[in-house]
Amino acid sequence: MVQAWSVSQPEWTCKIDEGPAGIAHARWSPDSRHILTTSDFQLRITVWSLVSTACVHVQWPKHAARGVSFTKDGKFVGIATRRDCKDYVNMLACNTWEVMGTFAVDTVDLADIVWSPNDSTVAVWDSPLEYKVLIYSPDGRCLFKYQAYENALGVKTVAWSPCGQFLGVGSYDQVVRALNHLTWKPVAEFVHVNSVRGPGNAVVFKEIEEPWHLDMASLYLNENGANEMLRGGESDSPNESHIRVRYKVVDFPMIVPFQKPPPDKPNPKQGIGMLAWSADGRYLLTKNDNMPTALWIWDISRLELAALLLQKETVRMAAWDPVYPRLALCTGSSHLYMWTPAGACCVTVPLPQFAVSDLKWNLDGTSLLLKDREAFCCTFVPMLSELDIEDSNNF
């Protein structure tokens, strides 16, 4: 069952029940007036209208949580389907939810699809068993096919740059390839190695823990305040561990912690499992699943590494500010980590037993939603100064 509530009208509510078909996944449409649910066993996708209570069915979706992509303007949606052992893409108009066209794609086992930012092309890629990235026009013409290598695990993550000039392709070979939108050939290959020796202008931030030292000489306390401080120092409260977490800038060369995946288990934790572009399209963040505690930030203007963040725990989630070149990440600890071109910082969440396992920005980049296993909280972040923005855009 899926339930929806109105923020402005608390008395309004909606319940969606597919009955025996079940619901494996649900998502909003861009206009927030429709909910798309995928039934169990990928039997159908149902589009539910919250205005007219009408519904439209799309048969045989390829995936439950993947294989659906909306255009940037929200007018069209592409849905990957499969029938008769063949992959297809259905194009629907979101105003009527009518099928505008359907075309077959040259994939063995389609993994996902995504519209380009300018809504002119659709990127389709195959399962990890077949390295294949296909670029289609909305009318079904195959414009380009890219294959970096054969006979090995292939594509793992794909992401368009905000301007649509580059298509980032992360693979199981621990390499990110940036394809140009004119030639559809790689303009850069970013290799993730465990021994990093440069470039010289890149910065490595390493998370460290250290005792919190309070310089009493720098404080001015009256007699009552001093007595209270002494009594507080004798407390057995667990909050007074006096341990702080911060980033330390370390020099090259740097050895990145590396984990070798077991060869006898499926879905190996290797390759580029996280790939995202900054709002201005200048920076690209990547995470190599072989190195789960490291987050790589690449400068597209210079085609080189800009920063490397080394955490004490596995990086759970990382997300760019939707407005500024600012990155937030979490590791399942009680800390929030942030990076900008000016530097990086660690912030402690002032809530007891709160472990940040996931996060999400709001649309204007002024606040973050932090998720724990059983709770959530909102944090407000300051806007970047004009000086920081100009510095980040100063090529």
Regions found by a protein language model. Give the residues of each.
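WD40-repeat beta-propeller superdomains and closely related acidic/aromatic-rich repeat-like regions
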Residues: 1-395
